[in-house]
Amino acid sequence: DQNTYDVFRDGSEEIGNNPDFQKYKGKLDFVFTSPPYFNREQYSQDENQSFKKFSAYEDWRDNFLRPTLTTAYEYLKNDRYICWNIADIKVGSDKYIPLEQDSIDVVESLGGEYKGIYKMLMTRMVGIDASSVKNSVKIDNTYYKFEPILVFYKP
C-alpha cells in the first residue's frame, strides 16, 4: 500500500461540500485541529476569513463552528477520536463567549461523546498573572496558562 495525500484550499466550514473531499467521508482515523477562536485569531484580512464572513458570534457559531465540527465528526471513522483545541473568549472583565461548551454541544448533538480535556501548557507570559486566567493550572506553586484540548469520541 502506498501513502497518498490531497491538498484542499477550502475553508473548514465549506470543505464538506467539495466533491473531491467527499470520498474521505467516514475514513479518517483521527482529527486534531485548532480552529480560529472567533474574532481573536485573525490570520489575515482576507474576506474569506471566518471572522470577516461571520462578524456576530451567533453567525460564526452556526455557520463556521457547527459545520467545521460536523465535517470533522462525519469524516471520522467510528470508534475514533477528535482532539479540538479551542478556548472561551473573555469579553470585558468577567464574561466569556462559550466556545468550549458550544463545541461540546455540537458534537453531542451529532451523537459524539465528550470525554474530557487535556491541558496544553503555554510558555510563561511576561506581565500576565496566570493565576487570574480562566484556563490556568498550578504546578509546583507556579500558575501556568493552558490551552484546552477537548477530546471527543465517535462511537
Please state what every model-predicted region is:
Residues 1-155:
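Class I S-adenosyl-L-methionine-dependent methyltransferase catalytic core
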